[in-house]
């Protein structure tokens, strides 16, 4: 609490033209976006987009983007969004600032995500669980093999040929 600052600013209450007080939140967001299961990403990502799964309440600034949906399992969606295929798609169809990805709502909503049965999502869900377990045990753990296996499953979901996979991977 800063009662002197608030008292000073309250002197100008008649001048304010909006409900946003100078000591209040600017463009506050609904609390539901911070609670429960969600995917969080930095709005500006270097090298490739990075999406993190969270199953606890956490409050982040607007430099982060929060995703909540009931159409897909959130761990499945985390795996797909972190895939090389989605990075390739965002590089060509999303917003870029130089070589940095800008993760925004519109490009993400444009990703043609497959609506598939939970049983087909399960291999990716299991791999994301394995990554979360390894990272919880050791934040520096090498998860490259698990990420490559997720990429393989994502390529299969979209029916990519070997030549298309080479294009995505820049080979």
Task: Please give the residue ranges for each predicted region.
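Polybasic, glycine- and aromatic-enriched phosphate-binding surface used to engage nucleic acids
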Residues: 1-120
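Non-catalytic DNA-recognition/assembly elements of restriction-modification systems
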Residues: 4-12, 114-171
């Amino acid at each position: 609490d800063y009662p002197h600052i608030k008292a000073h600013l309250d002197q100008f209450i008649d001048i304010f033209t909006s409900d946003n007080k100078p000591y209040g939140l600017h463009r506050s967001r609904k609390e539901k976006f911070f609670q429960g299961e969600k995917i969080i990403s930095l709005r500006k990502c270097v090298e490739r987009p990075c999406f993190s799964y969270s199953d606890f309440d956490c409050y982040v600034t607007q430099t982060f983007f929060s995703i909540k949906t009931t159409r897909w399992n959130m761990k499945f969606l985390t795996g797909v969004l972190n895939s090389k295929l989605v990075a390739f798609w965002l590089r060509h169809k999303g917003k870029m600032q130089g070589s940095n990805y800008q993760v925004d709502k519109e490009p993400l909503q444009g990703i043609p995500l497959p609506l598939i049965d939970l049983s087909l999502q399960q291999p990716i869900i299991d791999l994301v669980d394995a990554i979360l377990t390894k990272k919880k045990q050791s934040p520096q753990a090498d998860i490259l093999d698990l990420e490559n296996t997720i990429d393989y499953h994502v390529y299969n979901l979209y029916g990519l040929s070997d030549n298309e996979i080479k294009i995505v991977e820049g080979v």
